[in-house]
Each structure stands twice: as C-alpha cells, then as structure tokens.
Amino acid sequence: MSIRKLSQLLALMALLAVPFALTSCDDDWYYDDYWNGYYPDNDNNGSEADQMVAVLSGRWQGDMVYTYTDDNAKPGEKKRVSEKYAVEMTFYRSENAKDRYAGQGVEVDRNDQGDTQALNFTWWIDTRNGDIYIKYTDSNTIFRMDAASTDYGYHLGWETSRNAYTFFGYLVGQSNDDEIYIDLERVETPRKAKAATETTPLGAQSFGSTVDRWTPTWTLTSSKGFHRR
C-alpha cells in the first residue's frame, strides 16, 4: 500500500472514531461508585423495580418531621430536636436506560414561620430489596428508606382509604443520627414519568412494609430557619 493511501485510510479511521469518542463521554451518575461497589447486581432487575419507579416519579405534597441532635446543646448533653415542615418533593426519573432505577429531584420546605428552602437531591432504588436512597446535593448526606422494616420502614403506593397514591415513612441518615419522617400524597406525574406509566400500569400497587403512620408523642420545636441538610 502506498504512503498516500495509508495516510488516507488513517484519516478516515480517525474521522469514524469521533462519534464513538463523543458518545462515550456521558457523565457518570453521582452514585456510580456507591451503586456498583455495593450493589454489583443492580443491573439485573425485574419489573417490580420498574413499577416502583413509575409510582415514585412525580410531585408529592405533605408534611415532614426532621429530627436531629441539637448542635447547641450543653457539653455532654444529647438533645434531640424535631421540626415540622410543609414539604413538596418532586422525583424525576433518569432518561438514561442504564440508570432507569434512579433520578434527580427537588424538595421545597416551608416552616411555620413562613420561611422556605429548596434542596436538590438524587435518588436510587436498591433493586435487590426495594430500599430507597436519597442523597442531598449540597451536603452529600445520604438517607435510606428500609423496605423491610415495620418500625422504621415506608409505604409507597395506592392507599384505598385516601383514594390516592401516598408515600410515608422514615429516612434514616447513613452518616449521622438524623431521621426524617414524611407523609406525602402524589399530586402530579411529570412528563418524564408518563411514558413509563403508559407501559407500566400503576394500578393499586404498594411497596414497603409499613402500614401505620407515625404519631408524634411530644411537642414539635418551632423552627427558625432550617437545619442544614
């Protein structure tokens, strides 16, 4: 082969390689190390996980009780503080088929003083057991919702008594002792989730093992501002 033809062939091969180089540069999801490191089989999943995502995806409204250890407590004293907010949480599913059991979200809190805060988060489902994880973007704090626990678990799905899809239960901090309790009702399905609901009928499905709502047995703290999350 002549030098000229070889140069032309190499140039053509380089040109053909450009699209592959571009398409291989997709941003990795925030949780890739956590996801693949702890759950290597999460790509092998069934239709139940798809149904969970279809139910979870959407806009939810309700109440949140956030419990944490008071940073301003006296030395040696561990004082637990519980604050209640009106909350709206919107879950968007990933449009990437590889990450179809995960997504992003926005949370808007309002306290009894009328103050509001908006928080971005990412979420994913452990398809082996149905646990839901939420990671707040600003603090990188991860909370887990345990699908198997009857005391600190969750319910996600249709609730006949309310004639609505509801989502209530505990989020437990994985790197601190913070706890969040939510009691939400779905008010809207975003367009990103509609395609999934068309192919995955929601019906009267429910997930998680919690069936009873939590009732506070003490007076909630009147919140001034918001504890960092």
Model regions: which residues?
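Acidic, glycine-rich flexible loop segments
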Residues: 128-164
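Generic short beta-strand segments
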Residues: 61-70, 103-109, 136-140, 168-172
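Tryptophan-anchored aromatic micro-motifs
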Residues: 39-80, 125, 218, 224
